[in-house]
A protein has these predicted regions:
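RNA pseudouridine synthases
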Residues: 1-168
Length: 168
């Protein structure tokens, strides 16, 4: 993508939440380095369909573009897939859906969304990766306008002082 002053990283267009914007060029360089070197702790929240098999687990399938698709998918490393690692923990099981917290250790495009689709629990509202825009819970039917993935918390070194800072 285009290098723009202040923009340190990106979120998918439908993902809500915390975004880091640098105030100076020097800060931007340092913050981008921290993202590239995987020094930033990222925590996302999501509502996924169904219930994960485990209360917490690592999802470590390599990701890449499929041969005939623009979608990102699980692709073996031998076919060009790149390392992708996401830790999740189930916060609450809701019957037809679950509330999870995710910590991606790598920052691949659509990583969390693809990992949950692969697991059979797509993010609610994610039309690209099999998530429907309707959720039925406790006798109610809820329509959602976007996928239910939220960048909840970022922790990184302040670009000037080096002190660890957290934003939610």
């Amino acid at each position: 993508g285009e290098d723009r002053p202040g923009i340190v990283h990106r979120l998918d267009s439908e993902t809500s939440g915390v975004l880091v914007v640098a105030r100076t060029e020097e800060a931007g360089v340092e913050l981008k380095r921290q993202f590239a070197d995987r020094e930033v702790k990222k925590v996302y929240c999501a509502i996924i369909y169904g219930e994960p098999r485990f209360d917490s687990d690592w999802l470590e399938q390599p990701l890449g573009r499929g041969r005939q698709s623009e979608r990102i998918s699980v692709v073996p490393v031998s076919e060009g897939g790149r390392e992708a690692s996401t830790f999740y923990r189930t916060i609450e099981r809701l019957g037809r859906a679950s509330y999870v917290e995710c910590e991606p250790k790598t920052g691949r495009t659509h990583q969390i969304r693809v990992h949950f689709e692969y697991m059979g629990n797509p993010v609610v509202g994610d039309r690209l990766y099999r998530g429907k825009r309707v959720l039925r819970l406790a006798g109610g039917k809820f329509k959602v306008a976007r996928h239910l993935l939220h960048a909840f918390r970022l922790t990184f070194g302040h670009p000037v002082t080096g002190e660890r800072v957290t934003f939610e």
